[in-house]
């Protein structure tokens, strides 16, 4: 009989734990998030978390906290809740619905587990990482659902991963997808998606119209400090225009969803579309290449509010048309593109 001392037992236990590693790989999709419900209280909770992130509002806390808690969270939730109600579906918030469907389609395409989380709201990244650990996942490829990198989006999502790693002892191996703004698979998906819409509704350029590529804006100060977002948006727009065979005067790039009083990236989408209407451009098609899934900012802000702005500003003769081309969502072309990117980024794991 061979006796083992305590150190031998510890070594064997450690060896056994190591051998039990499954090398099981999974994909984690992360998007910004939505309130849990289109109610004032749910929106207030969501805005408190979202606007409380230093990535989103970079003001010193002593200056921002009184504004956020003393003014914004008292006045904005009611109006925002009404806006969310206008886009809410039987399944919930559009962003959540489309992200969930995209994850399911990718899981079928890739043959690996695909999880999804939200940086703000539910399901939180921490809760999903807990579920992944419980499922035996020990290698995670993180894909923030933003083709163009920005501190306020991609980096904020990756902060959620870092926070989890800091608070846990045993964490999975992690790889992250930084951006895919000029990836041929992504550009092909966008072009296929736009052409499919034009096959059904005609192309604006055949009517003397314009394709407007609207990206979410960020503060100009962020870009001035070196954020690559603006340059990546412009590159995406140029590549998409080339793939669609558009001349430079047949499309334009602009930025939407400005928040607060600071200057954001220009030109602003609402100004650009008003100018097109005032100039008598009879058809305007808007596509939002930076939005992986339709949400409040595309459905309500673009398809509803921006439509009204264009029609109100239109000064030409005859009929005017405004078309919103929906986000990639869970379309076959989107799933194919994401799968191509994931297989490359997960090389050696899959």
Predicted feature residues:
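Accessible peptide chain termini
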Residues: 1-2, 19
């Amino acid at each position: 009989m061979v006796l083992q001392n305590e150190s031998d037992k510890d070594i064997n236990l450690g060896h056994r734990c190591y051998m039990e590693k499954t090398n099981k790989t999974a994909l984690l999709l992360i998007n910004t998030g939505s309130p849990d419900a289109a109610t004032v209280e749910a929106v207030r909770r969501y805005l408190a978390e979202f606007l409380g992130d230093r990535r989103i509002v970079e003001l010193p806390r002593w200056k921002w906290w009184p504004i956020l808690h003393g003014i914004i969270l008292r006045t904005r939730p009611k109006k925002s809740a009404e806006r969310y109600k206008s886009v809410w579906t039987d399944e919930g918030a559009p962003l959540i619905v489309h992200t969930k469907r995209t994850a399911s389609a990718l899981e079928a395409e890739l043959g690996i587990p695909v999880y999804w989380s939200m940086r703000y709201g539910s399901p939180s990244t921490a809760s999903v990482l807990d579920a992944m650990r419980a499922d035996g996942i020990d290698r995670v490829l993180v894909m923030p659902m933003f083709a163009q990198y920005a501190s306020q989006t991609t980096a904020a999502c990756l902060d959620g991963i870092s926070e989890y790693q800091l608070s846990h002892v045993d964490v999975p191996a992690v790889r992250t997808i930084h951006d895919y703004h000029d990836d041929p698979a992504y550009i092909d998906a966008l072009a296929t998606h736009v052409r499919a819409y034009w096959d059904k509704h005609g192309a604006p350029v055949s009517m003397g119209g314009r394709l407007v590529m609207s990206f979410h804006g960020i503060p100009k100060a962020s870009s001035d400090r070196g954020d690559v977002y603006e340059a990546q948006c412009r590159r995406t727009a140029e590549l998409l225009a080339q793939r669609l065979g558009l001349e430079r005067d047949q499309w334009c790039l602009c930025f939407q969803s400005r928040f607060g009083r600071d200057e954001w990236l220009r030109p602003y989408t609402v100004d650009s579309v008003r100018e097109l209407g005032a100039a008598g451009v009879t058809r305007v098609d808007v596509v939002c290449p930076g939005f992986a899934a339709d949400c409040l900012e595309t459905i309500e802000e673009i398809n509803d509010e921006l439509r009204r702005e264009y029609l109100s500003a239109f000064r030409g003769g005859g009929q005017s048309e405004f078309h919103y081309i929906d986000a990639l969502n869970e379309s076959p072309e989107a799933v194919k593109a994401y799968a191509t990117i994931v297989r490359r980024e997960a090389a050696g794991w899959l």
